[in-house]
Amino acid sequence: MSRVKYNLVGNTFTHLTNGNKGYSVHGKEAKNLEWTSDNPFAEGTFYIDNTINDGINDGRKGPKYLWLLESKYIKQGLVESIIANRQLVEDTYETIFTHDQRLLSLGDKYKWVPAQGFWIKEPKVYEKSKMISMIASNKNMCEGHRLRLEWVEKIGDQVDLYGRGFNEIVDKEEGLCDYMFSVAIENGQYETYFTEKILD
């Protein structure tokens, strides 16, 4: 069976390196789906988060889908913009995939999907030789980021710290798999939002 091809607009999956942006679960290449970037024969095109205007303006043929992944704290104003321009958005997109309750209440075009997904590539029980890690970044654009940075200052060298701006790692496994526990603080908390940090 050949894989169904969809175009993907947005840089959400730039960490994937196999040429097919469409890993499925745990870093394995999808069996039935292939993400492409500019295939005129694709079944349709998915636009991720802030690429919403690309879908409205780019003139691509075929079905278009909007996929909202990030929290409302990271993509501030995006949901409000969709609500304010609801008719245009609904005329442009076949389906809007989201975890935002305000959008889900607007009608059948809006379908629930969990925010984000898995980042761990090899699901198994790992041998543990260290106690506590924390994966964070030095971003501070929203309250959750600032809370994480406060924790980083408080815990100091009591945990092994990884992430952008600290001890940078390529894959989350480097900061999780060898540890009994990992401190996770999400950048937002609200109904129907689910963090990949729990799954990782």
Describe the predicted segments one by one:
Residues 1-200:
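Nucleotide-sugar donor-binding catalytic core of glycosyltransferases
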